[in-house]
């Protein structure tokens, strides 16, 4: 036989998460798990939630069987995890006023600040037993840079690539799960796996009319620098050797203010206005 749900989630911790940036794990399982245990853990602050078990349109069924009302009672302001649920129907938004997955994205505290989660993956149908566990395994592998030649920093990228692994290993059964597994939240969200750190950047505050390049020294590789105006992206570049070089062909033709955002994995973004 295969692994039980509890054993499988322990495997995700032991094989992937424990060797990455995560420093603790709480497995809340039957028969001793409870809603209060789950809510206490989430309110204290967790980065990722893996759920594997029975579920329904309005909640989980095992371990910490939270429901829609419980999610709306969470107080984890500024400590929002992302969630991978293997279970039946938590994303069945089309037949319910508010599905379980929707509740995680809509929850707020008494002041209206977001609680719940930044993203929740849940199926709109009843899931089969084995195929989605292959997908969840791959998502955790990709998340922790353990899947050979496959690194993704976006919530949607991790999920889609995990589903492709499931499709390859499970064939038609995997493809059926992919068709109904739904991302609630922004798939382009760049996730964090650790407490974000500050970093420094050196750059000019002024862009001259006719200037061809804009150079930003960030001291790290893979840092994204983006320039925009009125919500329109004008130029962007990733740093190589700690330096990002941006083409100003669409930027320096006329004077005015330009918004700049500098972002990188597990860091606090730098935002500035250039003139």
Across the structure, where does each feature detected by a protein language model lie?
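Cysteine-dependent hydrolase recognition
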Residues: 1-274
């Amino acid at each position: 036989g295969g692994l039980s749900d509890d054993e499988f989630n322990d495997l995700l911790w032991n094989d992937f998460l424990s060797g990455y940036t995560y420093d603790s794990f709480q497995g809340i399982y039957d028969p001793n798990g409870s809603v209060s245990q789950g809510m206490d853990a989430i309110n204290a602050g967790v980065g990722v939630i893996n759920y594997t078990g029975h579920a329904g349109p309005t909640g989980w069924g095992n371990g910490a069987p939270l429901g829609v009302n419980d999610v709306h009672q969470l107080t984890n302001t500024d400590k929002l995890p992302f969630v991978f649920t293997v279970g039946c129907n938590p994303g069945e938004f089309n037949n319910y006023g508010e599905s379980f997955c929707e509740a995680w994205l809509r929850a707020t505290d008494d002041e209206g600040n977001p609680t719940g989660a930044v993203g929740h993956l849940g199926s709109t149908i009843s899931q089969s037993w084995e195929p989605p566990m292959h997908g969840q395994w791959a998502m955790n592998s990709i998340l922790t840079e353990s899947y050979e030649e496959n690194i993704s920093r976006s919530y949607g990228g991790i999920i889609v690539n995990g589903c492709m692994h499931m499709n390859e290993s499970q064939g038609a059964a995997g493809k059926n799960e992919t068709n109904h597994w739904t991302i609630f939240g922004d798939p382009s969200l760049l996730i964090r796996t650790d407490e974000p750190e500050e970093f420094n950047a050196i750059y000019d505050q002024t862009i001259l009319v006719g200037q061809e390049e804009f150079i930003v020294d960030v001291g790290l590789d893979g840092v994204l620098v983006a320039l925009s105006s009125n919500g329109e992206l004008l130029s962007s570049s990733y740093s190589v050797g700690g330096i990002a070089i941006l083409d100003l062909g669409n930027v320096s033709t006329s004077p005015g203010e330009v918004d700049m955002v500098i972002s990188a994995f597990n860091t606090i973004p730098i935002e500035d206005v250039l003139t």
